[in-house]
Every structure is written in C-alpha cells, then in structure tokens.
From Swiss-Prot:
It comes from Arabidopsis thaliana. Residues 1-59 form a transit peptide. This is Small ribosomal subunit protein mL104 (rPPR9). InterPro entries: Mito_RNA-Proc/Resp (IPR051240), Pentatricopeptide_rpt (IPR002885), TPR-like_helical_dom_sf (IPR011990). Belongs to the PPR family. P subfamily. The keyword Secreted does not apply.
Amino acid sequence: MPPSLPSLQLRRLLLRSFISSSSVNTLQSQPRIISSKPLFSPLPPSRSSIFSTFPSRFFSSETNAESESLDSNEIALSFSKELTGNPDAESQTISQRFNLSFSHITPNPDLILQTLNLSPEAGRAALGFNEWLDSNSNFSHTDETVSFFVDYFGRRKDFKGMLEIISKYKGIAGGKTLESAIDRLVRAGRPKQVTDFFEKMENDYGLKRDKESLTLVVKKLCEKGHASIAEKMVKNTANEIFPDENICDLLISGWCIAEKLDEATRLAGEMSRGGFEIGTKAYNMMLDCVCKLCRKKDPFKLQPEVEKVLLEMEFRGVPRNTETFNVLINNLCKIRRTEEAMTLFGRMGEWGCQPDAETYLVLIRSLYQAARIGEGDEMIDKMKSAGYGELLNKKEYYGFLKILCGIERLEHAMSVFKSMKANGCKPGIKTYDLLMGKMCANNQLTRANGLYKEAAKKGIAVSPKEYRVDPRFMKKKTKEVDSNVKKRETLPEKTARKKKRLKQINMSFVKKPHNKMRRRM
C-alpha cells in the first residue's frame, strides 16, 4: 500500500521529535497532530511501547514544576498530614511513603521546623520522617536540625526518643542540641536527670564537658529555682571545671528565684571568702528577693530592708546601675507606691545612671493604673525623646490599652490607639478585639462596627463574637402602665384630694344669688 509508507515515516519523525524535545509545550502539541488524522495506520508494537512512556514523562515534569512553585507552608502542611495520618505506623513504612510522595522535594531546616511544629500529635512517626531525611541525598543533618527533633521529643516528654536522636548523631550534635535537651529536661521538672545527663554526655553522646556547657546547665537549673542541685553539681565538678564569677552569680540568682535569701547570703559570703568579687548583678538579685519577700509578708518593711542592702553595697564599694533602680521602681509600682517610684526616677542621675526602656515602660503602666493619664502620656513622650521610641511595639501598646480599658478610660484609650497608628505601629487582632469588646460593653455598637470594618480593610482577620453589654450602660425599659388598673395614691396625692373635696363641701353651704337678681342689679 503506497499511502502507508509516508504515514510510517511521518510517525517516526514525530516520535524522534518527541524524544528529542524536553519542553512541555511540544509534548502537549504533538499528540493533537497524531489524533487529528484517522487515515494513519496503527503503530507497530515496538513503537507503541516507546509512545506509552510519554504520559508518565509528561506528568513527572508537571509535578516538578508544581513542586517548585509550591509555598513552603503548603509543603509543610502536606508533610504534617502524612505524619499525623497514621501516627502508629512503623518508621520504615513512613519513610517509604515519603519516598513515594515527596521524592522531588529537597528539605531544608525551615521546612523541617515548620513540619514538626505543625505535627504535635505525630509522636514516634517523626522518627520515620527523620529516616526519610537521612535517605535523601540532597540533605544532611546539622546541629540545628538535630536540635529541632530533640526539642520536638522533649516537648512531648518522650525523653527516650530524644536520647535516641542525640546518640544517633553523636558527631553532629553540638551546642544547640545540648541547649534544647537541657531546656526540655528542666522544664519537665527533672533536675536530677539533667545532672546524670551532664555526667555522661561526653562519653555517650559526644557532647563536650567544658565551662561553657556547665554555665548553660547551671543557668537553666537556676532559672527554674533548682539552685541546690546546681550548687551540688558545681561543687562535684570543681576539680575538673573550676567555676568563675558568672557561675557564682547564677547560683545566687537561683537561690533568689527560689526566694531563699539566707542561702543566697551564705553563698555570697563563701564567694567573698574564696576570693570572688560579688558584683552588682548578684546584689541586684538579692535586692529583688528582699522586695518580693517584703511584698508578700509586710510591705511596710520594704524601705528599711532595702536600705540595709543598699548600705552594704556602699560599704563594699559595689556601684549601683540602672538595673538596681529598675528593681526598686518595679517593686514600688507593684504595691501602688507610684509617687515614691517617680521620686526615685528623678534621683537616678545622682548616681550617674540613666533610665532605659524598661524603666519608662514600668512607670507608664503604673501611672496609667493610678489614673494619672496626663503624666503617663508625658512619660511616653520622654521615652521617645530618650531614643527608645522603637521599643514601643504593638505588645507594649496593647498593655497600655488594656490598663486604660480596665479603669474605664475608653476615650483616652482611643487617643492612645490613634497615636499608636500615627507612630507606624500596626495594631493586631488582640488590640482590635480588646477595643471592640469594650465599646460593645459600653453600648457603643456603631463605633465597634467602625473598628471592625477598619480591621477588615487592613486584612486583619478579627472574628466576630458575641459581646455582652454592661448593665450600667443599657437603656432602662419603661414599664407600660395599664390604664384600667387603678393606681395606688401616694400620701401627698391623698391629702390634696381630701382638701379639694372639703372645699367643695364647704362651698355647697354658701347661698348663691339667683340669676334674675343679678340681671336687675
């Protein structure tokens, strides 16, 4: 058949063009040409096998293009769905599923962190995710990525899995991994396990035991008030790692956080006898501890007890710094002694100290709480002129607005809200929700709706809620009086009615002239 030869040659040319071309457009256009001519004879079996591979090549290139355009958040969500879909599955099966579904994706640290944060219920399925990462040739673990898994298992209090991860990456785990492990153990309330981990971490997990790691462990323990265990650990390792002044200051702060002032003074005495200098940081911690104990037991003893600590600082030649004044001002404001705090604020320059951002923020909150609104606004202006205006973020403004709404100063809260926006600070969901709730409580629904529309225009997703109106601001409903029901007279009304009736009776006995007599007259 003569027409069959050109058709076969044309098909072979088309097949060569399919094989040589790699773009998606040629792959989409050529099948249309073939299907548009029904006169062509069918391909031989050998050629059909080659042509049958084209759809798979087309779809794989399409998925690669899509995977490059996908956002990292969407990829993390798909990873999380895969992990939480079957959390009881074995790690090998999870790794195989990831190889089948996500072989075209190259993981990075941000993607791993997002996936683990979105999958709190995955549990041990995260080990399968970790195996898939190990099998991926384009990825290699670092100290940071290992710390992500350590933090994940520690957050779930699965410390067995956490230790498995650390021992698996013995040569890779470093300072970040150690910090995550210690932090999770301390926050879980296992200080003894922390000391055991520190003793054998160099042999079992390849983590260095040096002064830096000891300082980290002591700091984490003392932040949660486990100063006794931290002090024992420091004394046991003193022959290997001799403590410095920083470690001693951390131990004093740990005793002060636990509100054990006697132990803190004992340790300070041992430090001074051992040749260590007690610095301003240690005295500030003891001063804060004294203020806390006085606030709890007897606030009137605050001033004499504070003076004792300050006199000891002067006797030992320890200078005051800004943190010293911040401790005093903060504790005075907590017991509503704002006037004394303002006096102390004015005397900071006598000791060569300048207020910082924390000083201004504490005083602004205290002044607003005391309803000294004008002075609070002046303090905000002073803070800006001192160069700390950038630290007035939406979190701090939210605290100011919450205080003003709490003392029923809604109008001033709205003026602070306007100045917040004028300074370039964008309010968030909590700020709008707070003001809308207060306006609805004051029965100002129109203004609340205006705020809701403003938030919607800015793209802030404020969810509408049911706000209760304060009964003080509700309009009192007038009771409808039924005219058929006889109203009970009051005593003045009854007296007036009796007087009127008596007058009528008295006037009835008076003889009145006739009309004819009036006309004659």
